[in-house]
Amino acid sequence: MSGVNTTAASQDACYISLLGLAEYFRTSQPPNIKKCIQCLQALFTFQPPSKVEARTHLQMGQVLMAYTRNIDLARQHLEQAWSISEPLMNFDDVKFDTASLLAQLHLQTEQSSHAKAMLRRAVELSQNNVYWHCKLLLQLSQIHANDREYSLASDLLAVGAESAEEAGATYLKVLFLLSRAMILMIERKTNDVLALLNSAGQIIDNNIPNPHQKEYLKVFFLVLQVCYYLALGQVKTVKPSLKQLQMSIQTIMAPNWPSDEVIFGANQLEMFVWLPKEQLYVLVYLVTVSHSMMAGYMDKAQKYTEKALTQIEKLKLQEDKSILSVFKVILLEHIVMCRMVMGNRELAIREIAAARDVCIAAPHRNLLKRHSAQLHCLIGLYSMSTSFFEHAERQFLVCVNETGERDLKLFANLNLAIIYLRTKREADLKQILDAVSTENTHTYSSQALMGGFYYVQGLHAFHKNSFHEAKRFLRETLKMANAEDLNRLTSCSLVLLSHVFLSIGNSKESMNMVTPAMQLASKIPDIHVQLWGSAILKDLHRMSKDAQHEKEAYANHVKYSENLIADQRKCVQSAHHELVNWFQGDPPVTSGASLNLPVAVATTEASTSAIQQPAQFGQFY
């Protein structure tokens, strides 16, 4: 009997020695992965017990996934680990770690259905282990969300919230509630989102004793609340929540704030973090940029974009997480529209090319698949602003066909309507306006986009010389824009209304409209309105025989025109201008002036698209 014990002890010593040696080689500088794998492989020659064998296969899979490109061998080891550990009792960490890693591996090889099947089985087996059950539910719901299977993701998160509640894990329950609210927001289930946010908000206020976890949850809650209001175009309503969010993130980023490891490391059921604080910091910048864009504060949007992009570059140097690329693309999408509003279209096309580069560089083209429609939309806006209307039309049509996002589709259709209006295609215009009207009658869309819809109808009526009808639509637009401080929509509506009054000979009302339009336009700044308004002012001053002011208005008009012409020349000479011809497949790689980070502030100004909308369409999940 003592001989058996001696042999077992000797084997144990061998296992420990080989594992120690493997870890030594793995953590060497630089790591010696070949020798690490050889040490782990040597363990199998001793015919170890099932649990040791399963754990070693898991470790082999982990090392191969982390340090090599040998996906097939990693899969073989993980599948071995799973087949051995699945029936074993009291072996949860190896069993479920293996399932989680195998699911990740299936995703890397674009086998989403295999990943879901693996995790569903693991979720079923983990019901007596709250930590793993919740972790696997979160992982599975994330995959369903990425595949746009939002109802399934939502159901899994509801199960997670119940499991956390049964285990008395309040912090974890709130994480599930907020994650579910995020999914419902993407689904546009407005009432359900409000109910969940209210429920989560009350728990955060009253039932989270740890002040650091409370502040962290508050940031998550406020990010969702701000995004909820912005998705509805409620720029004014959101201000108190945004201010609170900015204060909360400053608290979390303070030097005396404990690290995430300290806050979330004490209790296994509190080891769940939505985003680390450094990424939350970037996200708060991002929603602030979105708010500034919608409110019509282009300078602010540019300033915060530059800060966010600089922060992203710093984080990428530490660890290049995929979510940083998502943030970067969304920020670039926003800043592109800032440039076009201000008139710097040549810089806009450079930034579109930069967004394309980020998308192409992401693994498995995942980012390109998610943002292709937005890129087409941005190129459509650029083409439109440089008077390449045929290209713009095709870009918007590709966007409409590719996207499942209702707001992006509406935005592209409204810009298509403006193209049809400018190119005098009455039948196409009527068809698109009727379709937009039908689609949005029974749904609660963004205030900004619906205001834009009324604006386009007002523009259409103006072009038909139906001035009374134009006034009716534009007053509706102004009512919506003023209610939520949508400054760009207000200035566009005022300048068009001024033109309507000028056309019917009411110079007094025309002046009453164009004056605030120009004041707002210079604050934004929006050369589209400034160019239009200066032409109206020139005519009004001529009619009133005010030669001095007429001369000033004319000089301003010439200045804006010359800026546009100079920028147009730069655009057509840019290598990136070739992107206007991208209609399918991967975008072409263009070599031209590259983008320097942080982004430089625009110096020239122009835009021809009548309405703009932030490019974040619920894709922050």
Curated annotation (Swiss-Prot):
Subcellular location(s) per record? Nucleus, Nucleoplasm
Q: Which InterPro entries match?
A: MAU2 (IPR019440), TPR-like_helical_dom_sf (IPR011990)
| Record organism | Drosophila virilis (Fruit fly)
**What is the protein's given name?**
MAU2 chromatid cohesion factor homolog
The UniProt entry's GO CC annotations, sorted and at most eight, read: chromatin; nucleoplasm; nucleus; SMC loading complex
Q: What is its main location?
A: nucleus
Role: Required for association of the cohesin complex with chromatin during interphase. Plays a role in sister chromatid cohesion and normal progression through prometaphase.
Query: What's an example GO BP annotation here?
Result: maintenance of mitotic sister chromatid cohesion
